[in-house]
């Protein structure tokens, strides 16, 4: 829900037309703790991450769960412990890399690692596996109909980008760690990082290749 509220305010004001850019300034009581999408599980950090990263699912303005990077999802009839997700095709990360099932498997496993405060949301997950390039199965220890509620803040990272920048493991904020993802991003979201000064200012720009640009208003006249 936070994502859509912010998109309706921020994205609406980011571009007035193709020839005339507008800027919106968004003041908050507290800054994001980190840009690493799997390090912290708290409101201000998620609110900023939602602008640059997407989850498999999201919430609409009423709070209902709707499609995001996954277009279909259901527990398998033959095994209710397994959730199957059909992924959105044609999505790219901000650097142009294609999004596929390998990124989902990587991201969910990364969020389960020691030091990630997101791991509690995936505590019942015992396996995540790619069925094909755009299908992922997530198996839980028992039938878990509430699991999809935990996926709206579970952001998808580019596996290749993470490996290239040595951020396969999430930042452990409690231990005082920092990593490349602390100050840099590469998501599939509506906005791209331009610059960041912690506790002062974070500057974003519209993602011209955003997969959802035809679903949400991005121009104002």
Q: What would you call each of these model-derived segments?
A:
Residues 21, 32, 49-53, 66, ...:
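Extracytoplasmic/secreted envelope proteins and their assembly/folding machinery
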Residues 1-20:
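Gram-negative bacterial Sec-dependent N-terminal signal peptides
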Residues 22-33, 71, 81-85, 104-108, ...:
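Short, well-ordered beta-strand elements
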Residues 27-78, 109, 186-188:
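N-terminal lobe/hinge region of extracytoplasmic solute-binding protein
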Residues 86, 120-170:
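Surface-exposed binding/hinge segments that line
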């Amino acid at each position: 829900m936070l994502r859509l509220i912010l998109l309706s305010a921020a994205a609406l004001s980011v571009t007035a037309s193709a020839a005339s850019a507008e800027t919106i300034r968004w003041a908050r009581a507290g800054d994001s703790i980190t840009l690493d999408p799997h390090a912290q599980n708290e409101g201000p950090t998620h609110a900023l991450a939602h602008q640059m990263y997407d989850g498999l699912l999201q919430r609409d303005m009423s709070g209902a769960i709707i499609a995001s990077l996954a277009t279909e999802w259901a527990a398998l009839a033959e095994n209710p412990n397994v959730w199957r997700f059909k992924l959105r095709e044609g999505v790219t990360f901000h650097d142009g890399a294609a999004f596929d099932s390998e990124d989902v498997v990587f991201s969910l496993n990364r969020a389960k690692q020691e030091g990630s405060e997101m791991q509690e949301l995936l505590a019942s997950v015992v396996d995540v596996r790619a069925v094909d390039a755009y299908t992922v199965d997530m198996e839980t220890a028992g039938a878990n109909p509430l699991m999809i509620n935990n996926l709206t803040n579970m952001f998808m990272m580019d596996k290749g980008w993470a490996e290239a920048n040595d951020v396969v493991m999430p930042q452990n904020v409690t231990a005082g760690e920092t990593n490349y993802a602390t100050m840099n991003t590469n998501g599939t979201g509506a906005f791209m990082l331009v610059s960041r000064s912690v506790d002062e200012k974070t500057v974003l720009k519209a993602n011209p290749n955003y997969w959802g640009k035809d679903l949400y208003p991005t121009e104002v006249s």
